[in-house]
Amino acid sequence: MSVPAAPARAVGRPTAALPLWHLLTLSVYWLGMNLIWGGLDVILQARMDDLVGVAQAGRGIALMTVLGAITAMVVQPTVGAISDYTVSRWGRRKPYILIGTLFDVILLYGLASSNTFVAVVAFFVLLQFSSNFAQGPFQGYVPDLVPARQVGLASALMGVMIVLGRVFGTFVASIVGLIFGNIFLATVSLGVVELVTALMTLRWVDEGRPAPPRARSWRAIATSAWGRDILRHRSYVWLLASRLFFLMGTATLVGLMLFYLRRSHGLTDLEAGLWLLLAPAVIAVTTGLSTFPAARASDRVGRKPVIYAACLLGAVGIAGVGLAPSMPVALAFVVLFGMGAGAFLAVDWALMTDIIPKDTTGRFMGISNVFSAAAGPIALAVGGVTMDAVGAIELGAGPRAAFLVAALFFGIGALLLRPVDPRRRDD
């Protein structure tokens, strides 16, 4: 049975409240998508020394993620804009979710089977294409289907699913890939889980309102995703920039964690795998504990104060990890980091949903995720180069220096949030 959409105006946000189960079904695919990237964060770090050598590992990760991000930046808003006007028996978004997910599974198999840096990069870039082909349309569901008073809760659920996906992906990669040594099985398993969550979405979500009338060619719609009119939405642009820097901070910790464990603390792969199970579990718990209170607080005091608090927690957390003399101390600061990440994931998405126009949500959400996708490559380009440069002097200091640089990203994210007008728009 499908999840019925809330009654809606011809254009604009629905008005009738949705049951909690319906909100959960709108969020489950976030788990599947993020499980892939959480797992690959570990798998690709584990493989990079063998693919390009220890001295070039940071640059190798940076190059691969930059190429993948360029692909995501082109695909996601373009396909999101096209899906706004798509008419099919399944609705506007579902065809793209199905096609993208099926190709994800195929490309993960190819990536798992590849043994050269060039082949791994090629499959990674193609995976970014297929994943964003699905994600661009999918993230239009909350603005399409959720009434304004439930956006905070829906965003909190989305945040929980994102974190759970990242954590479970890390678990799969750490247990199957590092501890048991089967990188191939770990990689393929990620695609299987994503496929299950996609099928749940396709089965249970009713997309509700139809596409608006299409008065332009498909080419014009696709290119309109990049129209300069977006610059007139100044609060939206400032929020995009703020999101970029916050996520650069989180991407640095996640993207360089295995290097940190190996080089800064001298852990073996088995020891690192165990810590990679514990640290994400701590992040998951702290995120879960902070997400829903943060969403409720944002409904009372506003979205921006909660995001400011998240930036502070993130900066203190990652700086503490970078300076920690031992893993137990680092884990204590991971708690602060997780609390900040949970608060941000719950509230940033709600603020974005509040301020964008409601008739072309696929386009605006697609562009927003361009900045989300760009955060990882930019962070790893800066962090990877920093790690290699400092590591040439003292190997263990490289990841620590990268984490301290990342603390600055959170501060910049807070500053860029100041010009954002948080008032809700329903047009």
Show which residues each predicted segment covers.
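Juxtamembrane intracellular "pre-TM" segments in multi-pass secondary transporters
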Residues: 2-19, 207-241
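Helix-loop boundary and gating motifs at the non-cytosolic
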Residues: 9-69, 237-242, 246-266
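Intracellular juxtamembrane helix-capping segments at the cytosolic ends
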Residues: 44, 133-146, 343-357
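Loop-to-transmembrane helix entry
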Residues: 54-67, 185, 266-284, 398-400
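Glycine-rich segments within core transmembrane alpha-helices of 12-TM secondary carriers
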Residues: 71-73, 152-174, 369-380
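A membrane-interface helix-boundary motif in multi-pass transporters
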Residues: 92-94, 177-192, 385-408
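Structural signature of the two symmetry-related core transmembrane helices
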Residues: 93-109, 305-320
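Multi-pass alpha-helical transporter architecture, strongest
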Residues: 112, 195-205, 404-427
